[in-house]
Amino acid sequence: MIKKDNTMNLDVKSNLAKLLATENITIQHNAVKTASFDVKNRVLTLPIFKQKSGDVYDMLIAHECAHALWTPYEKWEGITDSELRSYVNVIEDTRIDKLIQAKYPGVVRNYENGFDILEKQNFFGISGKDINKDFMIIDKINLRSKSLNRLPFIFAPKDNDWLAK
């Protein structure tokens, strides 16, 4: 919720997160680059942006609450290789985003608008790049998911196995 003076009520956003997560998770608003969820300790950390957008915040909250609902701590902690963990995180993000959007269809619009706002700010680093030539398959999967399949990716036939998962 954005107040009339264009400030964001962080208490309201914290309560929204607890409702979406369906538990009394701990909420922190810190000077971090992006949101995160500590699956073990049940702590959601949200960034404090200079330019606030309700859609971006709601998208981040929904995504991190999806981790609260569906990311299994034991399996996640068992992945010790950092490169493998990065790949698994992209696949997990794709999986849980589909689940949260099915559980709470109203957040789909937040995802669309939030992605558009972040893309305009070049948050994803795609400005001036050929998304079909300059990105690895895992980055393409990540951006395809985050954009809700709205970016014009062309995948090689060998990539279809990854896309099916």
Label the predicted regions:
Residues M1-K165:
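Short, functionally important secondary-structure microenvironments
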